[in-house]
């Protein structure tokens, strides 16, 4: 293959028959595997949906990796790079003020980087709540005002998807974790020690 001829990749097996389904299932299991990280450091979702032109992806990822190194943080890279969208999740502890600070700083720097490459912050999943704050920066104030006018025309009483896309809250508001909060130790009949307790076991849920 072209990849092999150009010395790209470290494993290039040929997959046939039922093994193809196994490979696809591994890809589908990616999000669940990320959620199974034990402890308070989690693969945070905020920049996981960025997409750039495929030809720009190597440089974009190189700059992103250098940025993460400057922050002294690691990230998880997975999914469909062939579409120009390699899912990126910084591993952060959002239960600390430092983690929340890095959460915002990394997201802001990534927005600037994505715009540099004329990419999108929401290539697949949508802007929603966590990326809505950056929409004016990404598309420009005039385009954003147009979106607000369209929203007002179809939803004059603001009852549909409040705070999503337009008039979104800050990305670090209303999180389900709180920096410095003392968490109770809950006694359980079943053993959740492999997750460091039932609360952290519940935190493995990604909401999907």
Predicted features and spans:
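Noncatalytic alpha-helical scaffold of FAD-dependent oxidoreductases
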Residues: 1-79, 84-123, 127-208
